[in-house]
Design a protein with these regions (language model features):
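N-terminal signal peptide c-region/cleavage motif recognized by signal peptidases
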Residues: 12-14
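Repeated loop/turn-to-beta-strand initiation elements of outer-membrane beta-barrel proteins
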Residues: 74-77, 123-126, 163-171, 204
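Feature captures outer-membrane beta-barrel proteins of Gram-negative bacteria and organelles
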Residues: 66-68, 112-119, 155-163, 192-203
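Membrane-embedded beta-strand positions of outer-membrane beta-barrel proteins
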Residues: 29-33, 79, 114-116, 126-130, ...
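Surface-exposed loop and membrane-interface regions of Gram-negative outer-membrane beta-barrel proteins
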Residues: 52, 82-109, 115
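Outer-membrane beta-barrel translocator domains and adjoining extracellular loop/strand segments
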Residues: 41-49, 89-100, 136-149, 183-192
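Short glycine/proline- and aromatic-enriched beta-strand/turn motifs that initiate or cap beta-hairpins
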Residues: 18-85, 185, 189, 193-205
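Positively charged n-region of N-terminal signal peptides that target proteins for export
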Residues: 1-4
Length: 205
């Protein structure tokens, strides 16, 4: 692991050394942080809970990390890690969409994937990632109480604009749509969520 980290650091250093100012080439690192509106739903598949759902709609914290490199001018391929943390309590609803209970639990959608980001001449850019999605559910104030789903499928797409803040650094804003779905580990229900967010971006390229 130590050799891998040293090799990655050496690659990043050499990429920056040959990268031209105000161009999208070489090493690529993108960090984002912002807010989103997330719609989360858990639909029971088990007969004894038929018609019951768990829902959590509201404001979420939304953050991304993308790391990779440019394979052509203005085109970067990267690994993507995204987390959308729902700040709303989860609600249990019956078959008539009536709330029958409110829990002290919150949900997060996590995406691990591969993606691409392309920059246009005016530093407008589009980005997309596809990969595995996982949901975690925790009690508010107690991270040890809760659980996680099986791995499912998820994606993220976005469009944004950046301005140069240095020879290799860019700052800007990004709008994203993130989606994920997965079965729970007990196989009695399916989770899914989408989030529409606006985030600030910081890019080293």
């Amino acid at each position: 692991m130590k050799k891998f980290i040293l090799a990655l650091a050496a690659l990043a250093t050499s990429a920056l050394a040959i990268s031209q100012p105000h161009t999208h080439d070489g090493f690529f690192l993108n960090l984002t942080l912002g807010m989103s509106y997330q719609n989360f739903g858990y639909e029971y598949k088990a007969t004894r809970y038929e018609g019951m759902t768990i829902e959590g709609d509201g404001i979420s914290l939304d953050a991304d990390t993308k790391i990779g490199g440019c394979v052509a001018p203005n085109l970067a391929l990267h690994l993507t890690i995204t987390e959308v943390q729902n700040l709303s309590d989860l609600e249990l609803k019956d078959e008539h969409e009536r709330t029958v209970a409110t829990t002290n639990q919150s949900e997060s959608l996590i995406l691990f994937g591969f993606g691409a980001t392309y920059y246009f001449l005016d530093n407008m850019f589009v980005t997309g990632s596809f990969g595995l999605s996982v949901f975690t559910i925790e009690e508010v104030g107690n991270s040890r109480a809760g659980g996680a789903s099986e791995a499912g499928i998820g994606f993220q797409v976005g469009v944004g604009k950046e301005w140069w803040a240095g020879d290799e650094w860019g700052m800007g804003v990004l709008g994203t749509l993130t989606y994920g779905s997965a079965d729970d580990k007990d196989d009695i229900g399916e989770m899914s969520a989408y989030a529409v967010g606006v985030k600030f971006t910081l890019t080293l390229n």
